[in-house]
Amino acid sequence: DQYCASIAPTDKNQYTGLTKDYNLIVICAESFSPYVIDEQRTPALYKLANGGFRFHNYYCSFPNTTTNGEYALCMGLMPDMSRTKTASSFDVSRSNYLPYCMGNVFASRGYPAYAYHNYYGTFYDRNHTHPNMGYTFRAVGSGLDMPLSWPSSDKDMIDASVSEYLDSSTPFCAYYMTFSGHYQYNWDNAMSAKNRDAVCNLPYSETVQAYLACNMELEYALEDLFEQLERTGQADNTVIVLTADHYPYGLSESQYNELAGKDIDTTFEKYHNSFLCYIPNMQPVDVDTYCCDIDILPTLLNLFGVSYDSRLLAGKDILSDSTHVAMLADQSYLTDSFRYNAETGTAQSYDTRPVKDADVQAYCQYVSNVFSFSTQVLNNDYYAHVFGKSAAKQTQTYDFSDITNPFEEASALFAAENGYMQAKSRTEFGAQTSAAYGEVLRALYRMAGGTQSLSDAAVITWAQEHALISDDVFAQDTVTYGSVSRLFLRYLADQKIDVSLTETDKTQLAQIQAGYTELDDTTCLAMYWMRKHAILQDNDLGQYYSLADQVLNRAQISRCLQGISSLVQSTS
């Protein structure tokens, strides 16, 4: 309380309420870089970048980890940097009172607010965190009817969701966390492969071409969005905001230099990114203020005329005359006169003038306070204390300590919470234990609508009756990449899912079979199909087919089961 009382609040300014009663669409773009934007190749992104405010000194604070960048954007607070991906700041916030998140702001006015993600909702616990921010949340397998791939299509996400809010008679808020820009950047990346022809003549290496290709899916999503806004008469009253979650760490230092067309300073300049704030029919306003992720929320609150106590957010309205600093995750920072490297403890001005030690110390303390304040707000549910309210408490059934991979955590939660697999305890899933046929078959039985508790013998009989396994399979047998691929393909066919191959698939499969003659045709086909539909995967295509005889653990199987369930739901 004393710290907040000591902070000077920001004043209203000429832009306060500029977009009051407008619609708002916020896009957190996976691994986005400003070097993606090109007037000819990406006209929709170019339109976003040049209509409204142009923030020339915006920095994305984080080198990696989507959940941190997304948290800073949504909360106006720095995440607790001591936390891991599977025990993230968002996880903690799921039961906090969050009055300033844009979803809650719109919902408090009686307006619809939606959030979408084109991967599973259990990933990073978004199925719990995003409703607490005021959003009706949709994701693959939980209300968002679209195909899943690795990565999934941003265009498909936009196309599957816009009808839910564009016909609204009141202002609406829609939030998107995209996926198409996710690494690895090669032609095995589903979005890179899909858009290869759009970039194949560009003068870049394969990796950089693949990065640009997968980001073309974001461009096509935005083109569709603009078209739908025009169709529904919402184009002139919809603000669109886009920024990155983090630096595109899937590119090496030299590859990022290649993309930029120059050598990029790795301490500061690589974090220079885009905060696109498109306001229709507005002449561009150039803003040179130094700013970062946490400043977006208070800037939007001011633009939308929302009354808020600016002292309660770590970020500052960029359009105000407050103190402005672009802060990075390691507490390095940039001001309007110098930049400070936290690793070396040195400051450098933008010209030849020396930097005063007192200024460095003052800004270092300010930045440290921002991080500390943000952590205290999070861990102590501070807004509940200030406003005398609380969020609806959400029971966290499981908190698995034996899983550190957020992809596996999401799937383990899915499997345990739906009763498809049994966790060893509330805190242990048994992630590294080898998966056995009996458990996998019981999960498929339950997915198929079975309600009985089947013994090993009974579930084997059920599987044989449905032609899922041969007579020589026993419940205790472990499952491998190859055997589980065959099993899942038979299960999908039994569920009346079309598992046929296109002519392109057949050509690609023939090439794979020629390179892996030790694999029988049935196994090769099944593994190909599973990988194509992101049920089984490995970043290295060659390595993937070499795993046919490798045993899967329970965490890996849970991920497969989530993929199978999603596929059945989306095609039923």
Regions found by a protein language model. Give the residues of each.
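Solvent-exposed soluble domains appended to multi-pass membrane proteins
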Residues: 3-397
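N-terminal propeptides
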Residues: 392-572
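N-terminal hydrophobic targeting segments that direct proteins to the cell envelope
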Residues: 1-4, 571
